[in-house]
Structure formats: C-alpha cells, structure tokens
Amino acid sequence: MLRLLLRHHFHCLLLCAVWATPCLASPWSTLTANQNPSPPWSKLTYSKPHDAATFYCPFLYPSPPRSPLQFSGFQRVSTGPECRNETLYLLYNREGQTLVERSSTWVKKVIWYLSGRNQTILQRMPRTASKPSDGNVQISVEDAKIFGAHMVPKQTKLLRFVVNDGTRYQMCVMKLESWAHVFRDYSVSFQVRLTFTEANNQTYTFCTHPNLIV
C-alpha cells in the first residue's frame, strides 16, 4: 500500500511538471486518515468517501481483474468536474483495505455480486436446495424480481477425473449444467443436469458405465 501511495505521489509530481497543474491544494487538506500501526497501511479509513475518491482520480489506473469473493462491500461516489463527473467505486476487501476504481467489466461484476449477496431471497435459495423435503417455497413478487436481476441463467462446470480399474485407466469428464428461470408470473424454477463422458468421446467406457460404488 505504501508503495502504491509513493507511485501516486510520483505521478502527481509528473503531472505538475508536464501540465503545470498546481498540486499543493490537494484533497488531503480535507481528508483525515487513521493508520493502523501493525501492519502499516493495512487499514485506511476516510472521513469523507468523496475526498478519498477525488484524491486518486487524476492518476487512477485500472487494477487487474479480481474475484468478487475478495470483497465485503462497496460504495458509489459521484464526483465533480475534477473527475469529469465520473462515478467512482470504493471496494472494501476482507483485509480492511479500500480500492478506488473507475467503472470496468470486472468492477461491474463485483458490484453486481455484492449488491445481491445479502438479499434475503438469495440467502434462502441454498438452504431450500439442500432440503428437498421442504417442497415449494413461496416468495414475493419483489423477491422474484431481485432474484431475476442477480441470477445466472446458465452455468456449466467441468471436472476431469481418472477411473482406474487395475491395469486400465481412463480419463473422464463430469459436466454439471444448471439453469434458473423466472417466469412472467414471477415463479422461479431450477434445472440441473449431470453427464459423464470419456475425454476422447468414446461411447461405452468406465466413465459412463463404471463398476464403482461411490
């Protein structure tokens, strides 16, 4: 984090030299930060999120894509002419650090994930799926709209594994496909299909007809 701040400071000096832009009146004058002494710069909190965002705006470089699972929350920040009226995002990770990012494909994915993760309907679905004896679950129209806005219509996962039958072995592929759909009456349905194939698409193999008990 300290290295990142030094790099940002260097870019500020470079901008001053090239564009003759005064950097003395930086937003740090209205910015207060609490530094956690151990480890240094592990946590940085700002009195005003707008100040935090606009300070980094002139030399804000996109970060490499990151997994949504690394983050615990986010905040949108509307800026002014100093940031060309852009909307910036403060992304809070699980170590207490904050990323200031412009809108990008991976940032939109993180926002989409975080905005739906804490919704009640999305927390109920895994519990319902693990208890098939519960039958149909009644959900409200609002819950169905939230689910429809955050669901992934189709997902496909592949898993390769080896079946060893003494002297012979074969490379197998397990494909898990799942579908989710919200109908016009706001009812929700799920479908799951599990298929086994041989890696070279052979028809009758241990992969499709294993003599195993799992």
Curated annotation (Swiss-Prot):
GO terms for cellular component: membrane; viral envelope; virion membrane. It is found in: Virion membrane. One of its GO terms (biological process) is symbiont entry into host cell. Keywords: Host-virus interaction, Membrane, Signal, Viral attachment to host cell, Viral attachment to host entry receptor, Virion, Virus entry into host cell. Residues 1-25 form the signal peptide. Pfam families: Gp_UL130. Plays a role in viral entry into host cells. Forms a pentameric complex at the surface of the viral envelope together with gH, gL, UL130 and UL131. This complex is required for entry in epithelial, endothelial and myeloid host cells. Mechanistically, engages host receptor(s) including neurophilin 2/NRP2 to mediate infection. Forms the envelope pentamer complex (PC) composed of gH, gL, UL128, UL130, and UL131A. The pentamer interacts with host NRP2. Belongs to the HHV-5 UL130 protein family. This is Envelope glycoprotein UL130. It comes from Human cytomegalovirus (strain Merlin).
